[in-house]
Curated annotation (Swiss-Prot):
Name of protein: GTPase Der
Pfam families: KH_dom-like, MMR_HSR1
Source organism superkingdom: Bacteria
UniProt cross-references to InterPro entries, sorted A to Z: G_ENGA (IPR031166), GTP-bd (IPR006073), GTPase_Der (IPR016484), KH_dom-like (IPR032859), KH_dom-like_a/b (IPR015946), P-loop_NTPase (IPR027417), Small_GTP-bd (IPR005225)
Gene3D superfamilies: 3.30.300.20, P-loop containing nucleotide triphosphate hydrolases
Length: 442
């Protein structure tokens, strides 16, 4: 599981700059819950072969009682509760402030590792920085310059070194599919889960200290075994009531990472929101097989149905590989069809592709449409083989493959998916270029 790193500090100490540095300006997820004046931002970063989740909180005032600052503090408190590590950022130029001391007092009670990051410290003596901020009682200050990148790699190495390496979940002998049900609050996720598990199923409560952990629930349906990666904010015996569900972006992202197949639940009575699109985008980025269930279809008339289909086409057009179902989770209508698509998507995600057939498919694609030149060189693709599952990865070997345009990569992805009838899963292509060892030598 990716470690979650939360950035905390008073306003204008450089949290957003460090966030952009840690995520290399990749698109962030935003918790766009109504009424939030300033949203938390979520992004994925990578250093070497390690991935991590970064959360950028608004300027934090732990003693705020009302108004905007209180709302921002509430959001920061939620992020702190879900953190694996806290980066407490202070401003080396302006020095230690009473606001910093208030935040430090709160973080000492957080029960999480805290790293004291002194930003804007370029050109400053390390001993001077350490002397002033040691008084906070949070260990050795770590000088960085988020804007210039100085000290950031050392900071990441220190933080990530405290966590075990990422380990992909092993498939059991029966290759039981792991399913995550995700979506915004009140779209019908828990009702859908009840349709799968049955209302008398006992589901564990969140226990103290485990609020961040997704619960794995084995279940059987139509003679097939599955594991549900459950993230609902409320888990109880019998019906799960949507009205008190707590939405956690971090839990959602972790469930997606652990799953083989994700069921994205949408609400037919509401327009597709930015948050829906952000969640869908993360599913795609994670490479997970996907089934989309548009719930509450029985509650809307034909006019509304046509509008929502147009909205889906416009805002989720990047999910062309997924099957869409229009269901009523409350009545159980369409749930069986969703599970049939889950099975098909899982089979596609775990498919084994033969090297000869992959190479023939690639050669046919090249004959139909050659890759464009880059300068004086045209990419040469010699053979292809499978490099992994969940999602399927096709590795193409050749020469001058460093600058294949994205449009041509998409063309190859579509070609492979159509040739192998892969429905419900994205497909990734990786290039391996044979570099000339004599270049640059006399």
């Amino acid at each position: 599981m990716k470690p979650t790193i939360v950035l905390v500090g008073r306003p204008n100490v450089g949290k957003s700059t460090l966030f952009n540095r840690l995520t290399k300006t990749r698109d962030a997820l935003v918790a766009d819950q109504p009424g939030l004046t300033r949203d938390r931002h979520y992004g994925i970063g990578r250093v070497g072969d390690r991935d991590y989740l970064v959360v950028d909180t608004a300027g934090f005032d732990p003693v705020a009682k009302d108004g905007i600052m209180h709302e921002m503090a509430r959001q920061a408190e939620q992020a702190i509760a879900e953190a694996d590590a806290l980066l407490f950022m202070v401003d080396g130029r302006s020095g230690l402030t009473p606001h910093d001391e208030q935040i430090a007092a709160r973080l000492r009670r957080a029960g999480r590792p805290v790293y004291l990051v002194v930003n804007k410290s370029e050109g400053m003596e390390r001993t001077m920085v350490a002397a002033e901020f040691h008084a906070l009682g949070l260990g050795d200050p770590l000088p960085v310059s988020a804007s210039h990148g100085e000290g950031v790699k050392q900071l990441l190495d220190l933080v990530l070194g405290a966590f075990p390496p990422d380990v992909e979940p092993e498939e059991d002998e029966g290759r039981t599919p792991r399913i995550a049900i995700v979506g915004r609050p009140n779209v019908g996720k828990s009702t859908f889960v009840n349709s799968l598990l049955g209302e008398e199923r006992v589901i564990a409560f969140d226990m103290p200290g485990t609020t961040r952990d997704a619960i794995a629930i084995p279940f059987e349906r139509d003679g097939r075994h599955y594991t549900l990666i459950d993230t609902a904010g409320l888990r109880r015996r019998g019906k799960v009531f949507e009205a008190v569900e707590k939405f956690s972006v971090i839990k959602t992202l972790q469930a997606i990472e652990q799953a083989n197949v994700v069921v994205l639940v949408l609400d037919a009575s509401q327009d597709i929101s930015d948050q829906d699109a952000h969640i869908a985008g993360f599913i795609l980025e994670a490479g997970r097989a996907l089934v989309v269930a548009v719930n509450k279809w029985d509650d809307v008339d034909d006019y509304r149905r046509e509008l929502i289909k147009q909205d889906l086409t416009r805002k989720l057009n990047f999910l062309s590989f997924a099957r869409f179902h229009y269901i009523s989770a409350l009545k159980g209508a369409g749930v069986a069809a969703v599970m049939k698509s889950v099975d098909a998507a899982y089979a596609a995600a775990m498919v084994n592709l033969s090297t000869p057939r992959l190479t023939r498919t690639m050669q046919a694609a090249l004959a139909k449409q050659a890759p464009p030149r880059h300068g004086v060189f045209r990419p040469k693709m010699r053979y292809a083989h499978q490099g992994g599952n969940n999602p399927p990865v096709v590795v193409i070997h050749g020469a001058a493959l460093d600058h294949v345009p994205t449009s041509y990569v998409r063309y190859l992805e579509r070609t492979f998916m159509e040739a192998f009838k892969l429905q419900g899963t994205p497909l990734r292509i990786q290039f391996r270029t044979a570099h000339n060892p004599f270049i640059g030598k006399e």
